[in-house]
Amino acid sequence: MSLAKSAANKLDWAKVISSLKLTGKTATQLSSFKKRNDEARRQLLELQSQPTSVDFSHYRSVLKNTEVVDKIEQFYKSYKPVSVDVSKQLSTIEAFESQAIENAAETEKLVAQELKDLKETLNNIESARPFDQLTVDELTKARPEIDAKVEEMVKKGRWDVPGYKEKFGDLTIM
């Protein structure tokens, strides 16, 4: 038995999926591949367990017409199995493998970028001062559109912030 067959027999598919944290389409494809592989192995073992020799002498003793048995034996001995060209299937598998590797590399890049962004955000959150300690100048420096919006509201004579009364209530005495 070759090393590849030995490794394939010992492969724990559930552990592979869980240890690589595969989800979605990749996990589904791997599971369906495992299912097809198991079915092919089962059929191979079933066919290998069947007897391959034919006892023609038994059929000659049972049947009256031995010519038929002779012809069948002649066909049986002259039969040569057809060799199948599997290069097309192998090229399809190689194409699938290369596509899977490309998808994995792309996913790895996306995950690495997302992790970098999340770490940066976490550092910003951890190093940020509490909101109640910020000054107006610091807010307008961080978000210049706030200053522009306030200036526009003052020009139009609006002194109320939309939604403020609904959220915090009206504190006017009148």
UniProtKB/Swiss-Prot annotation:
Topological type in the membrane: Peripheral membrane protein
GO cellular component term, pick one: mitochondrial inner membrane
Stored InterPro entries: ATP_synth_F0_dsu_mt, ATP_synth_F0_dsu_sf_mt
Chief place where the protein resides: mitochondrion
Localization (cell): Mitochondrion inner membrane
One GO MF term: proton transmembrane transporter activity
N-acetylserine PTM positions: 2
UniProt KW keywords: Acetylation, ATP synthesis, CF(0), Hydrogen ion transport, Ion transport, Membrane, Mitochondrion, Mitochondrion inner membrane, Transport
A Pfam family this chain is assigned to: Mt_ATP-synt_D
SUPFAM superfamilies on file: ATP synthase D chain-like
GO biological process, one term: proton motive force-driven ATP synthesis
Function according to Swiss-Prot or TrEMBL: Mitochondrial membrane ATP synthase (F(1)F(0) ATP synthase or Complex V) produces ATP from ADP in the presence of a proton gradient across the membrane which is generated by electron transport complexes of the respiratory chain. F-type ATPases consist of two structural domains, F(1) - containing the extramembraneous catalytic core, and F(0) - containing the membrane proton channel, linked together by a central stalk and a peripheral stalk. During catalysis, ATP synthesis in the catalytic domain of F(1) is coupled via a rotary mechanism of the central stalk subunits to proton translocation.
PANTHER family reported for this sequence: ATP SYNTHASE SUBUNIT D, MITOCHONDRIAL
Family to which this protein belongs: Belongs to the ATPase d subunit family.
Designated name of the protein: ATP synthase subunit d, mitochondrial
Organism this protein belongs to: Kluyveromyces lactis (strain ATCC 8585 / CBS 2359 / DSM 70799 / NBRC 1267 / NRRL Y-1140 / WM37)
High-level lineage: Eukaryota, Fungi, Dikarya, Ascomycota, Saccharomycotina
